[in-house]
């Protein structure tokens, strides 16, 4: 597989074309950002940890029947993925109150949500990733009602699979965000990544935060926490 020019550079990953029109290479960098990219730092080993963590999770999801863009690892910081036409909407599933939900509704952090909540946000850093609903997505042409229904179905399947996976490792899956795209055959496929950058994970007993909130809130030991989560899950680093 030949790596060609950079197609897109995000806050923590770069996307490269390949000699296959249906495949891309994702490069996980050590860049760590918060507050819509207003704060960026380099954290050693982060790209490697997130790349291998993502590969592990995506393979678990594929085995459970969730279609993902992941194909295979290419090295410590790179993986091969299917090329998707990304839908500019983030799907957020929350099992416990945290983050923007606490700020928005004034509820207590850590409150168990019964049942979970499913939310949509427009993927637009310049606008602060605003909270939206299904009718906005359809009205503005970001996606169809059928695509949204499939995205929600897959998001809830991911929650079912990963809540148990993390629970077995002594962790609470507090919340997470997912992004989806359309593959060349028209199917909806889970894209982007799943890592501690895009979810909240707390130790079940101590409620210690084991995710990017350690960076956002200045708690320190960010990569050490990521590596501990990986070790508990059995991710080969």
Curated annotation (Swiss-Prot):
Gene Ontology biological process: 'de novo' IMP biosynthetic process; cobalamin biosynthetic process
This protein's pathway: Purine metabolism; IMP biosynthesis via de novo pathway; 5-amino-1-(5-phospho-D-ribosyl)imidazole-4-carboxamide from 5-amino-1-(5-phospho-D-ribosyl)imidazole-4-carboxylate: step 1/2
Family annotation (PROSITE patterns): SAICAR_SYNTHETASE_1, SAICAR_SYNTHETASE_2
Signal sequence region: none
Paired cysteines (S-S): none
Catalytic activity: 5-amino-1-(5-phospho-D-ribosyl)imidazole-4-carboxylate + L-aspartate + ATP = (2S)-2-[5-amino-1-(5-phospho-beta-D-ribosyl)imidazole-4-carboxamido]succinate + ADP + phosphate + 2 H(+)
Keyword Protein transport: no
Pfam families: SAICAR_synt (PF01259)
GO annotation, cellular component aspect: cytosol
Keyword list, A-Z: ATP-binding, Ligase, Nucleotide-binding, Purine biosynthesis
Keyword match ATP-binding: yes
Enzyme class: ligase
Family of this protein: Belongs to the SAICAR synthetase family.
Protein name as catalogued: Phosphoribosylaminoimidazole-succinocarboxamide synthase
């Amino acid at each position: 597989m030949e790596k060609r020019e950079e197609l897109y550079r995000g806050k923590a990953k770069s996307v490269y074309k390949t000699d296959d029109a249906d495949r891309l290479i994702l490069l996980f960098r050590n860049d760590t950002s918060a507050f819509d990219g207003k704060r960026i730092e380099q954290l050693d080993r982060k790209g490697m940890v997130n790349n291998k963590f993502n590969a592990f999770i995506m393979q678990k999801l594929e085995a459970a029947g969730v279609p993902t863009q992941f194909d295979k690892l290419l090295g410590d910081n790179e993986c091969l993925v299917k090329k998707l036409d990304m839908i500019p909407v983030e799907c957020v599933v929350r099992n416990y109150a945290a983050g923007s939900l606490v700020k928005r509704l004034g509820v207590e952090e850590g409150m168990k949500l019964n049942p979970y909540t499913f939310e949509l946000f427009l993927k637009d850093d310049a606008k602060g990733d605003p909270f939206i609903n299904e009718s906005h997505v359809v009205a503005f042409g970001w996606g169809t009602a059928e695509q949204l229904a499939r995205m929600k179905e897959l998001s809830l399947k991911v929650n079912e699979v990963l809540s148990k996976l993390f629970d077995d490792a002594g962790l609470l899956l507090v919340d997470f965000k997912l992004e989806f795209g359309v593959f060349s055959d028209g199917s909806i496929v889970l894209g982007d990544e799943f890592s501690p950058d895009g979810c909240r994970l707390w130790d079940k007993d101590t409620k210690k935060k084991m995710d990017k909130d350690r960076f956002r809130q200045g708690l320190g030991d960010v990569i050490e926490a990521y590596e501990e989560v990986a070790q508990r899950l059995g991710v080969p680093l």
